[in-house]
Protein backbone atom coordinates (compact mmCIF):
# COMPACT_ATOMS: atom_id res chain seq x y z
CA UNK A 1 0.00 0.00 0.00
CA UNK A 2 1.48 3.33 -1.10
CA UNK A 3 0.77 6.33 1.12
CA UNK A 4 1.49 9.79 -0.31
CA UNK A 5 2.27 12.63 2.09
CA UNK A 6 1.69 16.12 0.68
CA UNK A 7 3.78 18.71 2.49
CA UNK A 8 4.46 22.39 1.71
CA UNK A 9 7.36 24.24 3.34
CA UNK A 10 8.25 27.37 1.42
CA UNK A 11 10.12 30.34 2.82
CA UNK A 12 11.20 29.79 6.38
CA UNK A 13 8.71 27.00 7.01
CA UNK A 14 11.36 24.41 6.10
CA UNK A 15 12.42 24.73 9.75
CA UNK A 16 9.60 22.28 10.56
CA UNK A 17 10.51 19.58 8.01
CA UNK A 18 13.12 17.54 9.91
CA UNK A 19 11.06 16.90 13.03
CA UNK A 20 7.88 16.28 11.02
CA UNK A 21 9.69 13.74 8.86
CA UNK A 22 11.36 11.95 11.78
CA UNK A 23 8.05 11.70 13.65
CA UNK A 24 6.32 10.31 10.55
CA UNK A 25 9.07 7.71 10.10
CA UNK A 26 8.56 6.68 13.70
CA UNK A 27 4.78 6.76 14.04
CA UNK A 28 2.85 7.09 10.75
CA UNK A 29 1.76 3.92 8.93
CA UNK A 30 4.81 1.98 10.05
CA UNK A 31 3.36 -1.45 9.24
CA UNK A 32 5.60 -3.18 6.68
CA UNK A 33 2.74 -3.26 4.17
CA UNK A 34 2.90 0.55 3.80
CA UNK A 35 5.35 2.57 1.71
CA UNK A 36 5.51 6.28 2.54
CA UNK A 37 6.14 8.68 -0.34
CA UNK A 38 6.90 12.26 0.70
CA UNK A 39 6.00 14.97 -1.85
CA UNK A 40 7.61 18.10 -0.46
CA UNK A 41 6.85 21.38 -2.23
CA UNK A 42 9.59 23.81 -1.27
CA UNK A 43 11.95 26.55 -2.40
CA UNK A 44 14.65 25.11 -0.16
CA UNK A 45 17.70 23.80 -2.10
CA UNK A 46 17.94 20.73 0.14
CA UNK A 47 15.81 18.70 2.54
CA UNK A 48 16.89 16.71 5.54
CA UNK A 49 17.59 13.05 4.60
CA UNK A 50 16.62 13.37 0.92
CA UNK A 51 20.03 11.98 -0.08
CA UNK A 52 19.34 8.81 1.95
CA UNK A 53 15.65 8.24 1.28
CA UNK A 54 14.54 7.81 -2.33
CA UNK A 55 10.93 8.23 -1.20
CA UNK A 56 11.47 11.94 -0.45
CA UNK A 57 10.48 13.85 -3.58
CA UNK A 58 11.53 17.51 -3.46
CA UNK A 59 9.36 19.55 -5.84
CA UNK A 60 10.43 23.09 -6.58
CA UNK A 61 7.78 25.52 -5.39
CA UNK A 62 8.08 29.28 -5.07
CA UNK A 63 6.78 31.09 -2.03
CA UNK A 64 3.42 32.53 -3.13
CA UNK A 65 2.99 34.61 0.03
CA UNK A 66 -0.24 35.22 1.89
CA UNK A 67 -2.97 34.21 1.14
CA UNK A 68 -1.94 32.18 -1.93
CA UNK A 69 0.28 29.74 -0.02
CA UNK A 70 -2.91 28.35 1.50
CA UNK A 71 -5.58 29.43 -0.98
CA UNK A 72 -3.79 27.80 -3.92
CA UNK A 73 -2.38 24.73 -2.23
CA UNK A 74 -4.66 22.47 -4.26
CA UNK A 75 -3.32 24.03 -7.46
CA UNK A 76 0.13 23.15 -6.13
CA UNK A 77 -0.78 19.50 -5.64
CA UNK A 78 -2.31 19.19 -9.11
CA UNK A 79 1.01 20.20 -10.68
CA UNK A 80 2.08 16.58 -10.13
CA UNK A 81 -1.35 14.95 -10.56
CA UNK A 82 -0.15 12.25 -12.96
CA UNK A 83 2.78 11.33 -10.70
CA UNK A 84 0.47 11.03 -7.69
CA UNK A 85 -1.92 8.82 -9.66
CA UNK A 86 0.94 6.51 -10.64
CA UNK A 87 2.71 6.31 -7.31
CA UNK A 88 0.07 6.39 -4.55
CA UNK A 89 -3.06 4.64 -3.31
CA UNK A 90 -3.82 7.21 -0.60
CA UNK A 91 -2.94 10.89 -0.20
CA UNK A 92 -2.79 12.99 2.95
CA UNK A 93 -1.99 16.68 3.31
CA UNK A 94 -0.31 17.76 6.55
CA UNK A 95 0.39 21.34 7.62
CA UNK A 96 4.11 22.06 7.92
CA UNK A 97 4.08 22.50 11.70
CA UNK A 98 2.48 19.16 12.59
CA UNK A 99 4.22 16.46 14.63
CA UNK A 100 3.18 12.83 15.12
CA UNK A 101 3.25 11.81 18.79
CA UNK A 102 1.99 8.20 18.78
CA UNK A 103 1.36 5.36 16.29
CA UNK A 104 -1.21 5.88 13.53
CA UNK A 105 -2.32 3.14 11.17
CA UNK A 106 -5.27 1.88 9.16
CA UNK A 107 -7.77 3.94 11.14
CA UNK A 108 -6.94 6.80 8.75
CA UNK A 109 -7.64 4.81 5.58
CA UNK A 110 -11.17 5.17 4.14
CA UNK A 111 -12.65 1.89 2.92
CA UNK A 112 -13.00 1.12 -0.78
CA UNK A 113 -16.81 1.11 -0.54
CA UNK A 114 -16.95 4.69 0.79
CA UNK A 115 -16.44 8.07 -0.89
CA UNK A 116 -12.78 7.74 0.05
CA UNK A 117 -12.40 11.04 1.91
CA UNK A 118 -11.02 12.03 5.31
CA UNK A 119 -11.43 15.28 7.22
CA UNK A 120 -10.44 16.53 10.67
CA UNK A 121 -12.54 18.53 13.13
CA UNK A 122 -11.03 21.93 13.88
CA UNK A 123 -9.97 22.00 17.56
CA UNK A 124 -11.31 25.53 17.98
CA UNK A 125 -14.83 24.34 17.15
CA UNK A 126 -14.89 21.07 19.06
CA UNK A 127 -18.33 20.51 20.64
CA UNK A 128 -19.53 23.91 19.40
CA UNK A 129 -22.95 24.47 17.74
CA UNK A 130 -22.88 25.21 14.03
CA UNK A 131 -24.18 28.71 14.75
CA UNK A 132 -20.61 29.45 15.89
CA UNK A 133 -18.90 27.97 12.83
CA UNK A 134 -17.09 30.62 10.78
CA UNK A 135 -18.16 29.33 7.38
CA UNK A 136 -18.11 31.62 4.34
CA UNK A 137 -21.46 33.44 4.48
CA UNK A 138 -21.23 35.54 1.31
CA UNK A 139 -23.62 34.11 -1.25
CA UNK A 140 -21.38 35.26 -4.11
CA UNK A 141 -18.55 32.93 -3.02
CA UNK A 142 -18.31 29.32 -4.14
CA UNK A 143 -17.55 28.48 -0.49
CA UNK A 144 -20.93 29.83 0.69
CA UNK A 145 -22.69 27.77 3.37
CA UNK A 146 -26.11 28.95 4.61
CA UNK A 147 -26.86 29.48 8.29
CA UNK A 148 -28.00 26.28 9.99
CA UNK A 149 -26.14 23.95 7.64
CA UNK A 150 -23.09 21.86 8.52
CA UNK A 151 -22.48 19.20 11.14
CA UNK A 152 -18.76 19.89 11.71
CA UNK A 153 -16.25 22.65 11.11
CA UNK A 154 -13.29 21.01 9.40
CA UNK A 155 -9.70 22.20 9.73
CA UNK A 156 -7.60 22.92 6.66
CA UNK A 157 -4.43 21.46 8.20
CA UNK A 158 -5.14 17.75 7.72
CA UNK A 159 -7.21 16.13 4.99
CA UNK A 160 -6.85 13.23 2.63
CA UNK A 161 -8.24 9.96 1.38
CA UNK A 162 -8.02 7.58 -1.54
CA UNK A 163 -5.89 9.11 -4.28
CA UNK A 164 -8.69 9.29 -6.85
CA UNK A 165 -11.16 10.83 -4.41
CA UNK A 166 -8.68 13.35 -3.04
CA UNK A 167 -7.51 14.48 -6.46
CA UNK A 168 -11.16 15.02 -7.41
CA UNK A 169 -11.49 17.21 -4.31
CA UNK A 170 -8.39 19.14 -5.40
CA UNK A 171 -9.73 19.60 -8.93
CA UNK A 172 -13.12 20.86 -7.77
CA UNK A 173 -11.70 23.25 -5.18
CA UNK A 174 -9.24 24.63 -7.74
CA UNK A 175 -12.14 25.46 -10.03
CA UNK A 176 -13.89 27.22 -7.14
CA UNK A 177 -10.79 29.25 -6.29
CA UNK A 178 -10.48 30.34 -9.92
CA UNK A 179 -14.16 31.27 -10.13
CA UNK A 180 -13.96 33.32 -6.93
CA UNK A 181 -10.79 35.02 -8.15
CA UNK A 182 -12.55 36.04 -11.37
CA UNK A 183 -15.18 37.70 -9.18
CA UNK A 184 -12.55 39.31 -6.90
CA UNK A 185 -13.55 37.15 -3.93
CA UNK A 186 -11.25 35.53 -1.39
CA UNK A 187 -13.10 33.12 0.95
CA UNK A 188 -12.90 34.20 4.56
CA UNK A 189 -10.56 31.38 5.64
CA UNK A 190 -9.13 30.62 2.21
CA UNK A 191 -8.69 26.86 1.53
CA UNK A 192 -10.38 25.98 4.84
CA UNK A 193 -13.62 27.68 3.79
CA UNK A 194 -13.57 25.78 0.52
CA UNK A 195 -12.85 22.40 2.06
CA UNK A 196 -15.76 22.92 4.46
CA UNK A 197 -18.01 23.58 1.50
CA UNK A 198 -16.73 20.46 -0.28
CA UNK A 199 -17.26 18.32 2.82
CA UNK A 200 -20.77 19.73 3.26
CA UNK A 201 -21.62 18.41 -0.20
CA UNK A 202 -19.47 15.28 0.18
CA UNK A 203 -19.31 14.25 3.86
CA UNK A 204 -16.01 12.44 4.42
CA UNK A 205 -16.09 8.73 5.18
CA UNK A 206 -13.75 9.37 8.11
CA UNK A 207 -14.00 12.40 10.38
CA UNK A 208 -11.06 12.57 12.77
CA UNK A 209 -11.39 14.20 16.20
CA UNK A 210 -9.16 17.14 17.18
CA UNK A 211 -6.74 14.68 18.82
CA UNK A 212 -5.28 14.54 15.30
CA UNK A 213 -4.82 18.32 15.29
CA UNK A 214 -4.03 19.09 18.90
CA UNK A 215 -2.65 22.63 19.40
CA UNK A 216 0.47 22.75 21.53
CA UNK A 217 -0.31 24.13 24.99
CA UNK A 218 -4.07 23.53 24.80
CA UNK A 219 -6.10 21.43 27.23
CA UNK A 220 -8.56 19.24 25.35
CA UNK A 221 -10.32 16.13 26.72
CA UNK A 222 -8.17 13.61 24.86
CA UNK A 223 -4.57 12.60 24.34
CA UNK A 224 -2.80 14.33 21.42
CA UNK A 225 -2.10 12.08 18.45
CA UNK A 226 -0.80 14.77 16.09
CA UNK A 227 0.49 17.98 17.65
CA UNK A 228 0.18 21.43 16.06
CA UNK A 229 3.48 23.04 17.00
CA UNK A 230 3.21 26.63 18.23
CA UNK A 231 4.72 28.90 15.55
CA UNK A 232 5.28 31.63 18.14
CA UNK A 233 7.82 29.61 20.12
CA UNK A 234 11.36 31.09 20.03
CA UNK A 235 12.90 28.00 18.42
CA UNK A 236 10.76 28.58 15.31
CA UNK A 237 11.37 32.32 15.20
CA UNK A 238 7.75 33.34 15.75
CA UNK A 239 4.87 33.81 13.32
CA UNK A 240 6.14 37.10 11.90
CA UNK A 241 9.58 35.62 11.25
CA UNK A 242 8.05 32.72 9.33
CA UNK A 243 6.14 35.09 7.06
CA UNK A 244 8.73 37.85 6.78
CA UNK A 245 10.35 36.69 3.55
CA UNK A 246 7.46 37.84 1.41
CA UNK A 247 6.05 40.59 3.61
CA UNK A 248 6.61 43.41 1.07
CA UNK A 249 5.09 41.39 -1.75
CA UNK A 250 2.11 40.54 0.44
CA UNK A 251 1.48 44.23 1.14
CA UNK A 252 1.64 45.06 -2.57
CA UNK A 253 -0.83 42.27 -3.40
CA UNK A 254 -3.26 43.39 -0.71
CA UNK A 255 -3.18 46.97 -2.01
CA UNK A 256 -3.87 45.70 -5.54
CA UNK A 257 -6.78 43.59 -4.29
CA UNK A 258 -8.30 46.59 -2.49
CA UNK A 259 -8.00 48.68 -5.67
CA UNK A 260 -9.78 45.96 -7.68
CA UNK A 261 -12.57 45.69 -5.12
CA UNK A 262 -13.02 49.46 -5.19
CA UNK A 263 -13.44 49.56 -9.00
Stretches with model-predicted labels:
Residues 51-64, 111-119, 223-228:
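Active-site regions of enzymes building and remodeling cell-envelope glycoconjugates
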Residues 10-12, 45-47, 63-64, 98-100, ...:
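Short, solvent-exposed loop/turn segments at secondary-structure junctions
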Residues 40, 91-95, 118-120, 160, ...:
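A structural signal for short, well-ordered beta-strand segments and their strand-loop junctions
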Residues 61-94, 102, 190-200:
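A conserved donor-nucleotide-binding helix/loop in the catalytic core
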Residues 226-263:
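Long, low-complexity C-terminal extensions of enzymes
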Residues 100-139:
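Conserved donor-nucleotide/metal-binding helix-loop-beta segment in metal-dependent transferases, i.e.
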Residues 1-72, 80-87, 250-263:
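N-terminal anchoring/stem segment of glycosyltransferases
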